[in-house]
Structures are given as C-alpha cells and as structure tokens.
Amino acid sequence: MKSLLYPHPLSLPSFSSSISTAKPRHLTPPFLKLDSSAVKTPTLAVGAALDSATVNGFSFDTRNPTVSSSYRSSSLPKPNPTVLEAQTRVCTGPTQTKPLGEDQAFKVLDTILRSATGELKDEEPVSRAQLGAFFAAMTIRANCFPEATQWSEGESRAMNKYWPLLVRALPPDVVFIADPEGSLMGIGSSIGPQFVGNGTSEMRLVGALREVLAGGHLGFEEVQGCLRDVLPLKSTTEDGTATGVSESLLSALLIGQRMNRETDRELKAYCLAFDDELGEIPIADVKSLTHYGEPYDGNTRFFRSTLFVAAVRSCYAESSVLHGAEWMPPKGGVTEEQMLKFMGADTSLTPSQAKVLLEDEGVGFAYISHREARPSLYSLVKLREHIKKRPPLATSEKVQQFVKARGKEAIVTGFYHEGYEDSLLMLMKRRGVHSGLVVKGEEGALSMTTRLRPVNSSKGIPVNYCSGFCSLSMASACEIDGVSRQSFNLEVNAVDYGFEPTDTPRTDRSVLKNIELGLTALHGQKGPAYDRIVLNAGMVDHLLGCDGAEGISVALDRAREAIDSGKALERLWNYVKVSKQVRHRPAMCI
C-alpha cells in the first residue's frame, strides 16, 4: 500500500533550459520532483524519503501529513460532539441562528447534566468552554434576538425540565452565563446576580459579560483590558489545579461579541491588543510589502494559491508576508504552514528572521506563524475549537503587520459574510498601510477565481467582488485625507482578461494535492491552477497600484513571465532552503 501512495521519485528534466538563457538551478527536494508525464497529468511523485514520521528529515506530529485534519495536535482534548452540533446551530447571528428542535434540545441538556454529574460515559465530557459558548448563545438569543431566532417551544420545554437540575450541578460561572440576572429560567436564583468571579481579571471579565449577554457592546479599552488580563490562556497547572481565568467566561465573551456583531471599536481592540507582545516590530528594507491575511482555518474544498502567488510576485520585487497557523478551527483546512512544512521549510521563524528572507534577493517573501508572532492569541486554539463558531479574532487576525517595510505597504484579505468587508478596510486604514484590498473569494479566502458566476446565483455579494483603497502618495493611510486616497469596488470577471472559464481545482483537505497543483503550475503547465495564480498576482498588483502594473494586461503578462521563466519556482525552493539556514544564524546576524 505504501508503494502505491508514495511511488519512487522521478527525475526532473530541465524545464527552464528552453525558455531561459540563464543556467537552471533546481532546488526542488528529490521527493517532490516531477517528470514530464507528471506535468502533463499532475501527479506528485513522493519518494521513499517520505515515511510515516518524517519528510526530508523534518519531524511530523501527524499520522498522515498529506491531509490537513492530521495537523490537529493530539494533545488537544476533543469537544463533546452532541453539544458541539448544537453550538453550530445556536452560536451564530440574529438571522443565521437555527433554534433546536425539542428532541435535540432534550438530548443536549441531558448530555450537559450527565457530564456535570460524572455520569456521561459514552462521549467526551462537555468542556467548560463549550458550556460557556452554548449558554451564552442561549442567553443572548432570549434577551435580544428577533422572535424567529429566539428559543423554540421545544427549547423552552427542555430548559424548564432540566434547569432545576442543572442549577445545582453546574459551576457558578456557568450558572451566571446562563442566567445572569436570575430571572431568565423562570425560577429565582441568586447565583447569577451575585456572581463576581475570582480575582481582578475575572471581575473585569464578568462586568464586561453582563453587558454582552444583554446584547450590548464594549469600549476599546474595555476589550483590550479583558484580553490582556487573561492571555495567554493557562487553564491548568502541571498538578491539575485551575489557574488563570475561567474558560467558560472567556468563551462566552468571544462568542457573545460575535453574535452581537462586533462594532468597529471592538474589532480594533482585538486587532491591536498584542502589537507590542514581542517588542519592536522589525522593518524590512524593501520598496514594497504586501501582507496577505488568508483565513487561519484554511481551505477544505478548493485550491489555495496564495503561497504560489507570493513566489510569483517576489520575482519582480513585490515582497509578501504570509501569516497563519498550522491548524486552526473551525474548518481545520489546508494552510500555507502545512504546505511549507510538508515541502521541508522551517515554519517557526520569528518576525526578525522573516525580515531576512524578505530582504534576500533570491527569496523576497516570508511566512510567519501565529504561534511565533502572537503566542498569547495562539493559546486560544483549543478554546476556539470548543466554541465551534468563529470569534472576533477570526476577522482581526487577518489584518496584521508582523514585519513592516521602509517602502509602501499593503494588506490583502478575504471575507465571506456581507458587511465585514467594510470592517476589514477600516482595520487596514487603522494600520496605516498605503493600499488595502478585500476579496470575496471562495470559502471566504482572498483568491479570485476564473470560474463563471452561476446564472442562478444566490443573492448577496458575488465571488470575485473586490473593494479597497489605494493611496496616491507615500504618506500612510493614517496621515492622508480622503482626497489623496482612491477607493474602488468592482467584480472581477476573468473572461474579460482573456482567461478561459474554469472551475477552481478541488483539493478536499489534501495538502499533497494543493502542493501538486501549485508546483505543476509553477513548472509552466497551463491550466486552471496556472490561470488562478496569474490572475491573483496580476490583479492584486494592479488594484494595489504597484509599480509596472498600471495596465491589467501588462500586470498579467509580468506574472506569466515570472512563471514561464522558471523564476517563481526557483524562488519557492530558495525559500525552503534559506528558511532552514536563517533559523541557525546567530541572533546578532539577523
């Protein structure tokens, strides 16, 4: 079976010899080389160097590094599936929430009760984070949601039966979240009204939650104060005793603010709260730097092209910083970190080490892990899995500057839910970048597609919708007035620029398939993946106002040349090699 999955490596012919006079340099690791038939029919030849534990000497804590779901850390406790399914329905917005039916409501509350009393034997226990998220959602729905998404009759009957039992079995912090005023459940209780938390950090959090659970909003300083008080999250010590803040309270705050739809000041607080966590932000000596903010939880269906786009743009001095996580809930899809790790790159670079790669004339782009750049926020990975739905951080973490530039800066990110495009652009302007772009991409990602818009597409913002701004001077967005900044909104139709309409290639959580598509395209094989990389490199250059990209056709041709010359592929393998070298350089050399 292993020989079928990982055939012997095939030799790589000189793709660049016929299209470039420069001496070809093939930095492709042996286990990822393609032969001529592999380019015509994209099949990644992964050699015997890949075994169940290592790839090219790189250790994996995964059973199958070719699949995104295997990058979930085995040390993370799993959430209870029964309650998690209910959270999928109720921990969302005032129009998206789907009330539970009576049978499901009874099953969920019975599961919570049996877990609290230690009688749940056939499933994982219901975590404190799950309890906080679920009961916060129920409280907010009862207090301030429209009638259609308030409690169903079945939910009310289930709560009437189980609450007298739950109020005696649940810890006080969860009872507070479920009934903060002591009047919601129909039986008087003094626990909620009198609850203040343990210590000053929880006291601040409880005060904030009273506002959020009633459907209210918090100020900038209040949100930042809560976050800085409790993060990094430390739920238990080595001997198992509790420390830090209650996970139920924190999860209630995160999901509660999302359900209430965050205000601009709340999002700014999340975005900027830990900017100084690692000290002064390094400044790269590059003329142009684009920060790519892909969704941290990855792609589960479609080809993720941004890593390969960054390699293309670096060929003509458009530097890029990519940032994200190895694995992030709720989707747990394919990420740039998984691909780079699979290819043998070092994915634990600090921002200062990333600066070196940006300034390297043979590389020109870098990836920074959330784990290294924002350890406080990264400590929430387990909690984020247990609250199920995306917290405010899922929006704010996409608009970050882990490295700055001496030249112009831009931020590109994607969105899914209508309305968040304006919030993301607001955060970009607050960051002070010269240009910003948000894209309605497939799966909420930032990549444009070459597929045609369906004739019977649903209402709302279409895929390939772009909105952004471009500064006309070197002054930052914080310093210029509206006259000096051009705003734009458009829907990109790839057919208008000579692309054949094609569906986006599917990867379905396969890290291997995503790499295969990207490498095949960078080897010059024309097709949907190649077109998607060219479209996203050229259109981003044009929309951000990059030098040499004033005309769209010129920008697209420049991207094609970077691929067809072999330069983009060389840049990618330069990155793999140099990233490992940078990690071992003395700190004084960086």
Functional labels for PLM-detected ranges:
Residues 286-359, 366:
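A generic, well-ordered mixed alpha/beta core segment in the N-terminal half of proteins
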Residues 133-171, 252-293:
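Translation machinery proteins
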Residues 1-45:
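N-terminal chloroplast transit peptides
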Residues 114-119, 124-125, 232, 236, ...:
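Short, glycine-rich nucleotide/cofactor-binding loops
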Residues 134, 253-257, 274, 309-313, ...:
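Buried hydrophobic packing segments
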Residues 75-85, 89-146, 197-204, 212-264, ...:
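N-terminal glycine-rich anion-binding loops that anchor highly charged ligand groups
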Residues 252-258, 294-295, 329, 336, ...:
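Active-site-proximal beta-alpha loop/turn segments in soluble metabolic enzymes
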Residues 2, 51-87, 100, 148-202, ...:
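Glycine-rich anion-binding loops and their surrounding alpha/beta cores
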